[in-house]
Amino acid sequence: MSCPVIELTQQLIRRPSLSPDDAGCQALMIERLRKIGFTIEHMDFGDTQNFWAWRGRGETLAFAGHTDVVPAGDVDRWINPPFEPTIRDGMLFGRGAADMKGSLAAMVVAAERFVAQHPHHRGRLAFLITSDEEASAKNGTVKVVEALMARNERLDYCLVGEPSSTEIVGDVVKNGRRGSLTCNLTIHGVQGHVAYPHLADNPVHRAAPFLNELVAIEWDRGNDFFPATSMQVANIQAGTGSNNVIPGELFVQFNFRFSTELTDEIIKERVHALLEKHQLRYTVDWWLSGQPFLTARGKLVDAVVNAIEHYNEIKPQLLTTGGTSDGRFIARMGAQVVELGPVNATIHKINECVNAADLQLLARMYQRIMEQLVA
């Protein structure tokens, strides 16, 4: 017996949509949504394809996701070509199976079933889909959100289909994410010969006390919803490669994953104060990837928890751990934002896969969420 969720997932996987190339995935989704009465608005920016689709009016529940995937890596190590989906022992293999073409298929099929049962639903059901999430994320959801906000578009609830689960579908729901702030720091010294250090100024030596103090800072202790803020040095570069040259510059890149106990401005102020304390000559460039956001218990969280408890008979954990997602952009609209998707154990890996039965379960959960919020 065929399953529409699995069939659509397989069709999407066959389209090698390496970010930001959509490779025809959105056209496939749009065709299905048009047939059930959705209005489609293409919102492409640069090399990125996006669409905003809606049906009905009033209080709005949007389903958000991305069609792009990361590269497959060494294809010879896959049990099957990465863009030729195959099912083995109940597991559906293929690049994007878990992140996140399975979720996209579950969303579309859930919408089809929902509309068939509730053709005159009271609220508005919407889709926000992009092909630029895995790479730069500069022309995707963030641009669509900016355009929607500029025309005062309403968005009350948003379900992002990122693979949130860890062992069984629905065991973890993300109801927020930490902020992400990166510092690109250059410490300036004076290049010279290692035999004549008095004629040079070694930026590595200069920066060492600063870095020691930086890594020892306890930024906060987190709160009931977020773990403590984490700072990690990601890259350090200095020197010419020669053993007899004192470097003239030291480049250090470090990233903060910060909770709602802090703001990006507070972090910047403390780092700059520390640099001044150590009397360093420096240039700095900051990149704020996203602010922290949190969706407290309310209609959306309650609907998601209800759907999981109904179909999987487990109580999900509400967590804010992990990396950033496009939910950080959607939260700017004032919407309640929650992430619910399949198990994430194999995302971005060789032989990415998802339990086929989980996708069928996910579609039922999505449909129940629709029924609770916009039926």
Curated annotation (Swiss-Prot):
Q: What is its EC number?
A: 3.5.1.18
Q: Which Pfam families match?
A: M20_dimer, Peptidase_M20
Alphabetical GO biological process terms: diaminopimelate biosynthetic process; L-arginine biosynthetic process; lysine biosynthetic process via diaminopimelate
Cystine pairings recorded for this chain? none
The protein's annotated catalytic reaction(s) are:
N-succinyl-(2S,6S)-2,6-diaminopimelate + H2O = (2S,6S)-2,6-diaminopimelate + succinate
Q: Where does Zn(2+) 1 bind?
A: 66, 99, 162
Q: Which domain of life is it from?
A: Bacteria
Q: Which cofactor does it need?
A: Zn(2+); Co(2+)
CDD domains named among the record's database cross-references: M20_DapE_proteobac (cd03891)
Which residues does the entry assign to the active site, renumbered to this chain?
A: 68, 133 (proton acceptor)
Which controlled-vocabulary keywords does the entry list?
Answer: Amino-acid biosynthesis, Cobalt, Diaminopimelate biosynthesis, Hydrolase, Lysine biosynthesis, Metal-binding, Zinc
Protein residues bound to Zn(2+) 2: 99, 134, 348
| Top-tier EC class | hydrolase
The entry sums up its family as follows: Belongs to the peptidase M20A family. DapE subfamily.
What's the name of the protein? Answer: Succinyl-diaminopimelate desuccinylase
Q: Which organism is it from?
A: Salmonella paratyphi C (strain RKS4594)
Q: Which gene encodes it?
A: dapE
